[in-house]
Amino acid sequence: VGSGDRWSEWIQFRTAKAEIAPFSFLYFGDAQNSILSFWSRIIRAAYKKAPHAAFSIHAGDLVNTAHKDREWAEWFKAGGWIHSSVPSIPVSGNHEYTNLKVDGVDKGKQLAIQWRSQFSLPPASDLPDSLAETVYTLTYQGARIIALNSNREIEAQAKWLEKVLSENTSKWTIVTMHHPMFSSGAGRDNSKNRKVLKPIIDKYKVDLLLQGHDHTYARGHTPVRMSDTVNNKIKSLYVNSVSGPKMYDFRKDGWNTYKPDGVLLARKAVKTPFFQVIDVEGEWLTYRAFMANGQLYDAVRLHKLADGTKEMHPWKDDLGKER
């Protein structure tokens, strides 16, 4: 990349195939703090584990203070040339919004001034201008990826999401947003988002939801029938994760509070940063969560049947004790 006598080093990347084909991608929860000193280990370990990843999803709070150039510089330096070779799908978290003064006038909480200049994201119609390049969708080799902005204007996004999902013909559907549908951090809850968005997620049986915000790890699912302990069919798989050093305690009741919403908690962790590798191949989606040392901590497989229903298959190997 360059012009005249000024050129960057050589960078390789691969564009998507036009047809359905297998691929892998990375998913990170909040990086947020001590990005260069701590998060650099996570993103580099992730690349080492999945060097052919097609893209990486960053589920919000990439930095701690929205408008600070220094923090964004740390985020880009921590990933180094990985950011140049592996496209990012960034999600706006609450820390991507901070009060902004313009000519001495307080404009209230505004999206990071660097966001739209450093990320080139797909435009989305039928949405307020304030959501531009924070709510978008794309398809990749048979999968539809949808990024939501869980900070604001949820009702407008719900109408847009309904339309996108009603027209969706992709085999796999993945939604990513910052605030989790089912909170895992102590003292946290996002009831409005759940009330507005979950009925749509359930209606269209979105396959996978990738979230952040709670600085803990949680994986759960919505069974087709809560009382059926034999049938392994599910509606959706939900994950909350964290990749940076900031950590919270887990909810004392786990996800028991959310049982009326039809969700079950399968595995959790505290005080542990993770990166995730997701493999998509035909009717199979394989989800794996790794610790910074590359050790596998959690894994599960989804099998999409011909009628569009999903079966969840536990990992064949022992994953060890919960942290």
Segments predicted by a language model, with ranges:
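Loop/turn elements at helix/coil->beta-strand transitions in domains of secreted/extracellular proteins
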Residues: 21-24, 51-56, 83-89, 140-144, ...
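A short, polar/proline- and glycine-enriched secondary-structure boundary/capping micro-motif
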Residues: 37-38, 114-117, 156-159, 295-303
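Active-site-proximal segments of metal-dependent phosphoesterases and phosphodiesterases across multiple
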Residues: 168-209, 230-231, 256-258
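Extended active-site neighborhood of metal-dependent phosphoesterases/phosphodiesterases
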Residues: 1-12, 70-169, 188, 196, ...
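Acidic, histidine-bearing metal-coordination/catalytic regions of metal-dependent phosphoesterases
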Residues: 1-27, 32, 48-49, 271, ...
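Conserved, compact domain cores that house catalytic/ligand-binding motifs in diverse enzymes
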Residues: 21-91, 96-97
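Membrane-interface helix/loop caps of multi-pass membrane proteins
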Residues: 22-23, 36, 94-98, 135, ...
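Active-site neighborhood of phospho(di)ester-bond hydrolases with catalytic His/Asp-centered motifs
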Residues: 27-29, 55-61, 87-94, 148-149, ...
